[in-house]
């Protein structure tokens, strides 16, 4: 019997037979097309319409995001009236120079929504610095602590009073932004920012950011991709509940939890209601989550780029489906990556082959499982027994589904699932081991899972890259592909391995941490900048590719490094060394210093050392079995 999947679309269920996958795409797209798609937001200035199209296609600015972050000088109706008169004066064909003058006359520069803000809870020397023994790394962490003040943003009260003049979404409390072109808060970035802020003892700032987030859930129904109205049809990986968990571990502010638990549940319900899909495997139906944005038109912040690439499609329906795929990939946080390409059942192709809506991601579902577990715990604390049972049931169902649909025993990892071709996607991503972090597997078989995952990582040669773990092994030119290494993915792998309590996995977690910290430290020393992403192939190199230049700042990069320095600060050193011995106690360990000419020898020794660990582990397991 051929396996099949049931895809929920609106109120209907569509049964997709794997033997006829060429019909699957047609059926699903037709279902999506039955209802007219809404625009990214209701603004005829920032999200849709002739004004947006004319200005963005004129390429006044190098970055399309610049215009849609500007403030209108007059109300929207007056702005649109001025635009119509402008177009009439120039017979509907203004020059680029004339369009630029119109924009300068009609809009204030980007960033006009903010005022200076000096956080009251910032401290010059947070306690975690004392746990970092290496002087250079301690100074590095101290400087990262200072960067929070540069990344802090507080909105002017005028944004609240005259919200229609801005594309930014008003929130009552100051925020820490990623940096560079990202002038507003971003959803999943904020998890690592919060981790760093908590180490910096900026508890009031964190509480304000969490309060901002739940206010958005209350207002919009979920947390958007970022703090602009053009993001309000898409979200990002649902990291709010894990953020709250980090805050509660440090502050024990259960009054905040009691007041806002219903909003955490509301966000969870959004994902259950709007982002789930039924899949049948071996005659059993499972429910898992996917990313799925459904608005029309190009992304306003990348309007020209999207519009031009859409011209390879013939019909408006095909173009709108392509736009939805672009925005769905943005919702995933991985915009863009060959991870979301489907071409003849493979990950080959280019942006026109994006099929993010038809891929069940390991990481998204692992996070949703963890959210259900945490909501059960929170309701237990509040005495809501019926809700405890509900979330425990959800978590158990999710764990079973992840095991049945995503785990590949022969590969030794969890794999994304392609619902068009009804296959697991056997391509390396750091997120393929994320269930180890969220405990979304049979803990009783931990040793078996860990052994297979370690062999999987060794097979994919993750330690052959001096600058970190690459995002994928594909050379597509997209920024979420090789050779870029992204901070959150390093964090996921390190924490997943460390949480197993397996000494070999924890050793590997330490060595990945050491390599990542040293690469970031080297880049910072040479440029006095923290980057959004790094080059996996070289220590100290920043990443590239994608739609925009590499960004400085940078929120999640700082948070990850601070967390690793707090965790391993009693062992890490700034110099380029390869650890000769490592134990789990707190005593600093002896190291062997390598010269630049010995780098490859050191890598080889490290790989051999790990391989020996794998072999020894398997022998011990075999002896025990005998």
Swiss-Prot record:
Q: Where is the signal peptide?
A: 1-35
Name its GO BP terms in alphabetical order.
trehalose catabolic process
Q: Which residues are glycosylated?
A: 104, 274, 350, 384, 498, 525
Active site positions: 335 (proton donor/acceptor), 532 (proton donor/acceptor)
Q: List, in alphabetical order, the Gene Ontology terms for molecular function in this entry.
A: alpha,alpha-trehalase activity
Give the reactions, separated by semicolons, that this protein catalyses: alpha,alpha-trehalose + H2O = alpha-D-glucose + beta-D-glucose
Q: How does activity depend on pH?
A: Optimum pH is 6.7 when incubated for 5 minutes at 35 degrees Celsius. Active from pH 4.5 to 12.5 when incubated for 5 minutes at 35 degrees Celsius. Optimum pH is 7.0 when incubated for 24 hours at 4 degrees Celsius. Active from pH 5.0 to 10.5 when incubated for 24 hours at 4 degrees Celsius.
Please state how the activity of this protein is regulated.
Answer: Inhibited by sodium, potassium and ammonium ions, and by TEMED.
Which Pfam families does the UniProt record give?
Trehalase (PF01204)
- Keyword Secreted attributed: no
Query: Could you tell me the membrane topology recorded for this protein?
Result: Single-pass type I membrane protein
Its top-level enzyme class, in one word, is hydrolase
Where can this protein be found? Answer: Membrane
Q: How does activity depend on temperature?
A: Stable up to 40 degrees Celsius, but activity is lost after 15 minutes incubation at 60 degrees Celsius.
Cite the ranges annotated as topological domain Extracellular: 36-595
Annotated InterPro entries: 6-hairpin_glycosidase_sf, 6hp_glycosidase-like_sf, Glyco_hydro_37, Glyco_hydro_37_CS
Cytoplasmic compartment: which residues? 617-626
What residues bind substrate, as annotated? Answer: 181, 188-189, 225, 234-236, 299-301, 333, 547
Q: Where are the bilayer-spanning segments?
A: 596-616
- One Gene Ontology CC term in the entry: membrane
Subunit structure and binding partners: Monomer.
Q: Which PANTHER family does the record match to this protein?
A: TREHALASE
What family, per the record? Belongs to the glycosyl hydrolase 37 family.
- What is the name of this protein? Trehalase
């Amino acid at each position: 019997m051929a396996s099949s999947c049931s895809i929920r679309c609106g109120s209907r269920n569509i049964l997709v037979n794997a033997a006829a996958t060429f019909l699957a795409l047609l059926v699903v797209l037709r279902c999506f097309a039955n209802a007219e798609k809404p625009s990214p937001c209701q603004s005829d200035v920032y999200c849709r319409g002739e004004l947006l199209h004319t200005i963005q296609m004129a390429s006044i600015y190098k970055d399309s995001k610049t215009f849609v972050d500007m403030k209108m000088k007059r109300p929207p109706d007056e702005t649109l009236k001025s635009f119509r008169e402008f177009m009439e004066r120039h017979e509907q064909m203004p020059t680029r120079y004339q369009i630029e003058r119109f924009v300068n006359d009609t809009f204030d520069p980007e960033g006009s929504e903010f005022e200076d803000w000096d956080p009251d809870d910032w401290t010059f020397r947070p306690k975690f610095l004392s746990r970092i023994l290496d002087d250079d790394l301690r100074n590095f962490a101290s400087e990262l602590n200072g960067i929070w003040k540069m990344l802090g943003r507080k909105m002017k009260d005028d944004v609240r009073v005259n919200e229609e003049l801005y594309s930014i979404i008003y929130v009552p409390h100051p925020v820490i932004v990623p940096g560079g072109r990202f002038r507003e808060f971003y959803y999943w970035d904020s998890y690592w920012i919060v981790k760093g802020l908590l180490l910096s003892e900026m508890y009031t700032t964190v509480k304000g950011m969490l309060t901002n987030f739940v206010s958005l859930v209350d207002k919009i129904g979920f947390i958007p991709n970022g703090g602009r109205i053009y993001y309000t049809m898409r979200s990002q990986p649902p990291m709010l509940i894990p953020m709250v968990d980090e805050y509660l571990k440090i502050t024990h502010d259960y009054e905040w939890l009691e007041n806002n638990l219903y909003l955490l549940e509301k966000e969870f319900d959004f994902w259950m209601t709007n982002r789930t899909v039924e899949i049948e495997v071996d005659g059993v139906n499972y429910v898992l989550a996917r990313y799925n944005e459904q608005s029309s038109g190009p992304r306003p912040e990348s309007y020209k780029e999207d519009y031009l690439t859409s011209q390879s499609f013939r019909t408006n329906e095909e173009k709108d489906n392509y736009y939805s795929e672009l925005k769905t990939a943005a919702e995933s946080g991985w915009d863009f990556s060959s991870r979301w390409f489907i071409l003849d059942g493979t990950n080959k192709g280019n942006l026109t082959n994006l099929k993010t809506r038809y891929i069940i991601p390991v990481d998204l579902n692992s996070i949703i499982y963890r959210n259900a577990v945490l909501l059960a715990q929170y309701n237990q604390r509040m005495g809501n027994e019926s809700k405890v049972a509900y979330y425990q049931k959800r978590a158990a169902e999710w764990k079973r589904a992840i095991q049945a649909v995503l785990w590949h025993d022969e590969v030794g990892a969890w794999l994304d699932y392609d619902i068009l071709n009804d296959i697991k996607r056997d391509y390396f991503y750091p997120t393929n081991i994320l269930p180890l972090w969220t405990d979304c597997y049979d803990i009783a078989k931990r040793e078996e899972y860990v052994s297979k995952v370690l062999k999987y990582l060794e097979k994919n040669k993750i330690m052959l890259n001096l600058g970190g773990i690459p995002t994928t092994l594909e050379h597509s030119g997209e920024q979420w592909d090789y050779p870029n290494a992204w901070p959150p993915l390093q964090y996921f792998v390190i924490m997943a391995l460390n949480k197993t309590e397996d000494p070999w996995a924890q050793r590997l977690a330490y060595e990945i941490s050491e390599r990542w910290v040293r690469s970031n430290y080297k880049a910072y020393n040479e440029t006095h900048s923290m980057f959004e992403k790094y080059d996996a192939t070289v220590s100290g190199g920043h990443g590239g590719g994608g739609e925009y230049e590499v960004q400085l700042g940078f929120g999640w990069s700082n948070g990850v490094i601070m967390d690793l320095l707090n965790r391993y600060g009693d062992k890490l050193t700034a110099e380029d060394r390869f650890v000769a011995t490592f134990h789990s106690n707190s005593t600093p360990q002896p190291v062997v210093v390598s010269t630049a000419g010995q780098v490859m020898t050191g890598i080889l020794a490290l790989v051999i050392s790990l391989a020996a660990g794998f072999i020894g582990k398997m022998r011990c397991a075999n002896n025990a079995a005998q």
